[in-house]
């Protein structure tokens, strides 16, 4: 008989074991220790044991769901009227027994008790405070299509797709040539790549998630004035080495002032950043973009990133 309860302190090893046995795709870090879950999930200041619900067959954890309220608009605390179900796992031997349905129903009830009226199914930037760096690379981008069951489960339980993300990687060991045009040549002559700590003006929400990862902010600056034309955040993805067999970095936010758009500065930034990471023996850069963000998808593809998966977020009317 399957029983359901909230998180207990004895659960971390059982959850780590379930993660390893759940046949997750390339979007999930592999070979994770209990310490990884302790650091990225259970040690978060807003972790609520009632938001992590497990399904048990006697003493064995065979499934779990994790839900949380979204961050507020100021990115200073949780408590918005929105929330999300950011993780759902059921052991392959226990699927098609309505365990996932029961877990998501209980997660929805938890969010309702927290005052949440709008629920997303799938990790997004405003709802996922726990699994950044463990699932989805460096950015929350929904449940991965590659995992195979999410779309059918969502349709069967009344969820409708509300957002899709394109998941990209750039192979830094490949023989493909970077693009060349007059703007890029001019940019390279007058700019250089600078590196800095990205946490200088970070918000509480940024620090609780990305502050737990190795990170660097790259800026493309004018040599003469030191004025920054574009910048981006890069995060270490060493937890993916067992799964991917290569050292990887994740691309976060890309920033460019409006007055500098139209000059390919952001493309120059990504190309110079790729060269630097290659010199540091990084062989893969992982990135994602909402399908509605045409500018980012076009930029990534122009810089040599290739789509390898799709992330999906769902909602209920």
Go through the PLM ranges and name each one.
Residues 1-41, 48, 52-57, 61, ...:
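Short amphipathic alpha-helix that is part of the acyltransferase structural core
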Residues 42-57, 63, 208-219, 223-228, ...:
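A short helix-loop-beta-strand connector motif used in the catalytic cores of GNAT acetyltransferases and
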Residues 61-87, 134-146, 151-152, 236-248:
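Conserved acyl-donor/pantetheine-binding loop and adjacent beta-alpha core of acyl/acetyltransferases
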Residues 63, 163-164, 228-230, 309:
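A structural microfeature
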Residues 72, 122-124, 138-172, 306-317:
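Conserved catalytic-core motifs of GNAT/GCN5-like acyltransferases
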Residues 85-95, 123-126, 252-262:
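A short, internal acetyl-CoA/4′-phosphopantetheine-binding micro-motif in the GNAT/acyltransferase core
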Residues 90, 96-109, 118, 262-276, ...:
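Conserved acetyl-CoA-binding loop-helix of GNAT-fold acetyltransferases
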Residues 111-142, 277-289:
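Conserved GNAT acetyl-CoA-binding A-motif
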């Amino acid at each position: 008989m399957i029983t359901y309860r909230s998180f207990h302190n004895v659960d971390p090893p059982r959850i780590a074991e379930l993660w390893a046995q759940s046949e997750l795709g390339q979007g999930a870090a592999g070979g994770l220790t209990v310490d990884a879950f302790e650091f990225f999930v259970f040690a978060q200041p807003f972790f609520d044991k009632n938001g992590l619900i497990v399904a048990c067959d006697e003493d064995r954890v065979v499934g779990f769901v994790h839900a949380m309220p979204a961050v507020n608009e100021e990115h200073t605390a949780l408590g918005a009227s929105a929330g999300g179900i950011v993780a759902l796992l059921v052991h392959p031997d226990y699927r098609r027994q309505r365990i996932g349905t029961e877990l998501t129903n209980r997660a929805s009830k938890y969010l309702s008790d927290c005052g949440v009226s709008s629920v997303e199914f799938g990790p997004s930037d405003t709802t996922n405070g726990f699994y950044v760096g463990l699932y989805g690379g460096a950015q929350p981008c929904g449940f991965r299509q590659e995992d195979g069951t999410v779309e059918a489960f969502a349709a069967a339980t009344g969820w409708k797709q509300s957002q899709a993300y394109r998941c990209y990687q750039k192979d830094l060991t490949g023989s493909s040539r970077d693009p060349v045009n007059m703007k890029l040549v001019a940019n390279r002559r007058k700019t250089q790549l600078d590196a800095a700590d990205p946490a200088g003006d970070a918000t509480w929400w940024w620090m609780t998630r990305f502050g737990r990862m190795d990170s660097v902010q790259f800026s493309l600056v004018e040599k003469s004035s030191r004025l920054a034309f574009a910048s981006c955040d890069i995060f270490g993805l060493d937890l993916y080495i067992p799964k991917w067999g290569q050292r990887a970095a994740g691309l976060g936010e890309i920033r460019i002032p409006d007055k500098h758009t139209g000059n390919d500065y952001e493309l120059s930034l990504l190309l110079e950043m790729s060269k630097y990471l290659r010199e540091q023996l990084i062989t893969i850069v992982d990135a994602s973009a909402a399908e509605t963000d045409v500018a980012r998808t076009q930029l990534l593809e122009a810089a040599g990133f290739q789509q390898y998966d799709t992330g999906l977020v769902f909602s209920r009317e």
